[in-house]
Amino acid sequence: MAAGFFQAEMSILSSTLARSYSLPIRKTLMTFDFRIAMQRNPCLRIRRSCVAAFSSTPSHSRNFPIRGLEDVFVGYLFGRKKATEVAHVVWEQVIQKGDTVIDATCGNGNDTLAMLKMVMHDSVGCGGYVYAMDIQKDAIESTSSLLDQAVGSKEKECVKLFNLCHSKMGEIVPENARVRMVAFNLGYLPGGNKSIITLSDTTLSALKAAERILKPGGLISLVVYIGHPGGREELEVVEAFGSGLPVSDWICCKFQMLNRPLAPVLVFMFKREN
């Protein structure tokens, strides 16, 4: 049996997910327990087969609706993948070449680099832009250093770095920019000063800014770390914000381990293309 189970709370389950596990769609906040899925899906029920599936076979089986998510999701279910890896695969389903995206808490730069690779045109180098910001100067320097090591100077020009609080994102993006995604890692800088953390009030301001600038078909992605003082309160703010978004325009969900209370929580808010 897996070390932890997910609980996904959704304002509306997508039709593809509902079809995959034969679940009803309800216009209410509902709980999706993957223990039910494990009973209904042979791959999830047999751990040995699952491990073989995500370690040696190509992703996107005929029975799984989202390309690439099967491997990383089952890996996360069995403790072999990180929450950020799940987030990255979800991003790949949304971000297109040439898009404008925002890394609202760039930290050590790993998310920024992943976004850059998703928005760059292979033939022309740039095309898209990543606006990366962090309130800590050390984080900006770490991100810049990682980019220097990983990409060329031309590609690095596609990243705009800002030593600012994430609540200021509306001030750094050009007025005519259509933002495809805004991503957050909420908590403290890995390897940095643990007393410097993201705060509930500034995170709420940042979410409101993201809601305003995000284009239809865009995504707000959050990995919320809750093992530090203030982390759970910040998660509650994120949950309240997502729960308050209109169902007609947004699909909001949360993935959380049930028996690991300090594990990071994944939250996705997808803006519908009406």
Curated annotation (Swiss-Prot):
Pathway: tRNA modification
EC number: 2.1.1.61
GO MF annotation list: methyltransferase activity; mRNA binding
Biological process annotations from GO: methylation; tRNA processing
Subcellular location: Plastid, Chloroplast
Coiled-coil regions listed: none
SUPFAM superfamilies hit by this protein: S-adenosyl-L-methionine-dependent methyltransferases
Function, in words: Involved in the biosynthesis of 5-methylaminomethyl-2-thiouridine (mnm(5)s(2)U) at the wobble position (U34) in tRNA. Catalyzes the transfer of a methyl group from S-adenosyl-L-methionine to nm(5)s(2)U34 to form mnm(5)s(2)U34.
Recorded family membership: Belongs to the methyltransferase superfamily. MnmM family.
Protein name: tRNA (mnm(5)s(2)U34)-methyltransferase, chloroplastic
Organism in which the protein naturally occurs: Arabidopsis thaliana
Lineage: Eukaryota, Viridiplantae, Streptophyta, Embryophyta, Tracheophyta
